[in-house]
Amino acid sequence: MTLNQRDQFFSHCHGHPQKPMEIYMFVDPLSPECWALEPAIKKLKIRYGRFFTLRIIAACSITALNVQKRKKRRLAEAWEKIACRSGMSCDGTLLHDKALSAPYLASLALKAAELQGRKAGLQFLRCMQESLFLNQQDITEEQVLLAIAEHTQLDLEEFKRDLHSQSAVKALQCDLKIAAEMEVASVPTLTFFNSLREGEGLKVTGNYSYEIYEEVLFEMLGDEPKPSQTPPLELFIEYFQFVADKEIAVVYDWTLEQVEREMKKLAFARKVERVEAKHGMFWRYINEHHDAGPLYQCEK
């Protein structure tokens, strides 16, 4: 992918102070419902990212409380049900074997990663989710978090310091305060704000189809703008590096059967490789240059 191609299809997806809208996305890295939101968020950013900046707000206390109260077996079963319903694989095997040691640490690590930039935080969050839900790694353990930081090409020494710093603690406390003030009781929750309009934002709690989020965005914009061009499939895979068949289906308005046909063509051309998950399928882009570090794809 050339820089011009990247700019043409993806530059508008990043944060910019002149965008009229901001979306607060309240998440917990341990929440399978937040993981299930990935396809809709990808599509919204690709089609209308020129209008909004996405701000990640950690709401760890909500999921942490549920993790501590519910029996491991029941929690694992809930993960499996969410995977079957959403199409985003969640393997609850880890929860049968052990309890997550320090649920808050995953959100603290997210804030530590964000100290190296908003984009770094988003990449770190995605990699945490892949590690937990696909690879059954305990992202509440520091060694796992350090491996994720290295994989997402953060400054590792800086991340180690920040993970134990007051800066990360204060950032997390600020997020929890925002969640309390906005009466966020569960994750995921998206709150849409328009800087050009007075009044409170619109809050959407729960996991819905892409069309619901698009409708709320239009309502807050007061307009139904034309969507940005969706990138060709190969460029999409190259940019994100590791994606679920469900994500492709949502972004391109395809059935899973159509996704399978199109991805087989790329696999035959040795552009991608298939990665089977417990529920569904993922696809990894094959980098021509091995030193071209991947954006995502956290492996075991």
UniProtKB/Swiss-Prot annotation:
Keywords: Cytoplasm
UniProt superkingdom: Bacteria
Protein name as catalogued: ClpXP adapter protein SpxH
Keyword Zinc set for record: no
SUPFAM superfamilies registered for this protein in UniProt: Thioredoxin-like (SSF52833)
InterPro entries: Adapter_SpxH (IPR046404), Thioredoxin-like_sf (IPR036249)
Pfam (any one): Thioredoxin_5
Function: Adapter protein required for efficient degradation of Spx by ClpXP under non-stress conditions. Interaction with Spx stabilizes Spx and exposes the C-terminus of Spx for recognition and proteolysis by ClpXP.
Organism: Bacillus licheniformis (strain ATCC 14580 / DSM 13 / JCM 2505 / CCUG 7422 / NBRC 12200 / NCIMB 9375 / NCTC 10341 / NRRL NRS-1264 / Gibson 46)
Entry annotated with the keyword Cytoplasm: yes
Family: Belongs to the SpxH family.
Gene Ontology terms: cellular component: cytoplasm
Subcellular location: Cytoplasm
Xref: PANTHER family: CLPXP ADAPTER PROTEIN SPXH, GLUTATHIONE S-TRANSFERASE KAPPA
Assembly notes: Interacts with Spx.
